[in-house]
């Protein structure tokens, strides 16, 4: 119910403001489905966090099917009146990056915070699949941050011991800037779309 109310509010807002302007959707969808995965997360936080019709503490096949249907329906509904861009999941680090770097520097054992690409794919395969289905069903576009945050083997929470995150899953200002090339296409196309919007 809270999710439904939020989506209704978003629809109302979008219907009245900047009709036709591009919409970028970026959120921690894998956490909604599988719960928190960072160090120190409470047991309740490690359970599924967002529900539609199927209530479950774990991501059962029935839960995933229900989540998938509502996710795609919502995304396609938003795409009826504007270009919609879904951002692939931002890599989640397993610990707070600045804290980890700071402790390492104090102890003379500083090293970059990373997760493996394999762990990223295992965590986010379901979200990728439903984003792909939304693209197939209603022409939604997808933005991929991995070329800017990862290499072939690892996704980085820091580079040269400089944090890219303010915690374990939110990019810092420095980290955000790495994604400017990813967003450039959106804003170039968005400027064209907005210039054609008719206002009374």
Question: Which stretches of residues belong to each language-model region?
Answer:
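Extracellular glycan-modifying ectodomains
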Residues: 1-200
């Amino acid at each position: 119910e809270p999710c439904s109310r939020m989506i209704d509010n978003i629809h109302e807002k979008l219907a009245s403001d900047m009709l036709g302007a591009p919409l970028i959707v970026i959120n921690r969808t894998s956490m909604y489905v599988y719960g928190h995965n960072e160090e120190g997360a409470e047991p309740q936080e490690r359970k599924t966090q967002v529900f539609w019709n199927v209530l479950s503490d774990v991501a059962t096949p029935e839960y995933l099917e229900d989540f998938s249907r509502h996710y795609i329906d919502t995304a396609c509904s938003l795409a009826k009146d504007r270009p919609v861009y879904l951002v692939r999941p931002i890599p989640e680090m397993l610990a707070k990056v600045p804290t980890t770097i700071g402790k390492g520097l104090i102890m003379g054992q500083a090293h970059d915070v990373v997760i493996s690409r394999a762990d990223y794919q295992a965590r986010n395969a379901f979200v990728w699949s439903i984003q792909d289905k939304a693209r197939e069903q209603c022409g939604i576009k997808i933005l991929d941050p991995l070329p800017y945050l990862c290499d072939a083997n690892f996704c980085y929470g820091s580079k040269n011991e400089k944090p890219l995150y303010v915690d374990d899953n939110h990019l810092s200002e420095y980290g955000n800037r790495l994604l400017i090339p990813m967003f450039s296409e959106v804003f170039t196309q968005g400027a064209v779309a907005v210039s054609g919007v008719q206002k009374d």
